[in-house]
Amino acid sequence: MFVDLHAHTGGISTCCKVGADKILETAKEYGFDGLAIANHYVRNYFTEETYDSWIEKYIAEWNLCMELGKEYGLRIFKAVEVTMEYDKRLHMLIYGADEAFLRNNPLLCDKSLAELYGICKENGCALIQAHPFRSGATVQDANFLDGIEINCHPNYQISYADRVMEIAQKKNLMVTVGCDYHADNYRPCGGMFLPEELKDGKDLVNYLLTAKEYHFQVHEPQDDRIYQASFRRETQEILA
């Protein structure tokens, strides 16, 4: 199945231009079989006093997407995009998170990368650095990452796919692909080709952490080119 591993909805991500229903409707129209809903988790969305009520809204948005997914025939995976408070250029995608994870681990954005990675490992989650070169950012310490993302958002000018795969190969990291879709530009057609039997976030994490080869499609924002590729932790190959 073809899954965009990085999508937002307007119910939580205030920079997203439309609500969950339109996000899923558009994904279905563009041929996706599933989405990872990774709304922003950023410090200016809450205070320590309002965290509990805000996180319930975050969870409710996940659940709304799960219900809409049934209507549209889309597999929905729960994910989180954490903006690191110590350097707001750094956004970390968490796959495998669920309601208990968010309720039991507050203020993730205030953690160091090492602390966040430790929390993810304790809870069976995978930690991926999103758009690792945006705004002059660099790939962070691979000891505290499971992977790095090829990001197809049209506002980012280039996906850095070759660079991401080269670094991932050297550092034995996984590669994920997502469009970071906010409905603020055209709908890119980038994502991962995943086994149909993946039913939820834990299945997704198990696959991402154990697969030796990943197959995906990149929608290159620089020239609107769409191509498929595969990545092995030792080798990488452009298919077509």
Where are these regions (language model features)?
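Surface-exposed amphipathic alpha-helices with a cationic face
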Residues: F2, K28, M66-K70, S112-I128, ...
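Conserved beta-strand positions in the central sheet of alpha/beta enzyme cores
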Residues: A36-I37, I128-Q129, E149
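Binuclear metal-dependent hydrolase catalytic cores centered on His/Asp/Glu-rich metal-binding motifs
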Residues: R89-N123
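An N-terminally biased module of ancient metal coordination in phosphate/nucleic-acid-related enzymes
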Residues: M1-K78, T83-E85, N143, N185
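Short, flexible loop segments at the rims of nucleotide/cofactor-binding pockets, characterized by
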Residues: G11-T14, W54-I55, R103-L107, A126-I128, ...
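Charged catalytic cores and adjacent phosphate/nucleic-acid-binding surfaces used
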Residues: M1-L5, T9, S13, G19-E25, ...
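Active-site-adjacent beta->alpha loops and helix N-cap segments on the catalytic face
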Residues: K57-Y58, P106-E115, I158-E166
